[in-house]
Amino acid sequence: VVHATSTGAMYSDVAERYAADDYMQKGTVVMIGGTEEITEATGEMTDRVFGVTSTQPAFMMNSSAGNNDSHPYIAMVGRVPVRVIGTANKGDRIVLSDTKGVARALAANETANCNQVVGVVLQNKTDAAENTIECVVQCRV
């Protein structure tokens, strides 16, 4: 069953609410676990990546569960800002960094399986600091 008021959307991701064990910034990489359903992802290049907290989902599933602080929307698929540290080039794959909840570009000499990849970068990032950048993501289970 689809409940909709139009066939288009202003934003670009499909997201679902999940119970979080703590408040999470928008663009945070998450994994299943913690004291609730999801927690900030840990472990550089982990294959337990589940998704990314959404900023403005186009389609919101499980919308009556909690609020943005207790049950953030997790982008299941689509275009979403992701917290990334270090430089990244458009088209780079991103994986979890050694910083909790933050991704990084996969280095040229590294390989990753599909469960380690958070998404693909849509814009160049030229500084080393942590910032959010647009990426295409897909939920992993």
Question: Language model features by range: what are they?
Answer:
Residues 1-141:
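Extracellular receptor-binding modules and their adjoining Ser/Thr/Gly/Asp/Asn-rich linkers
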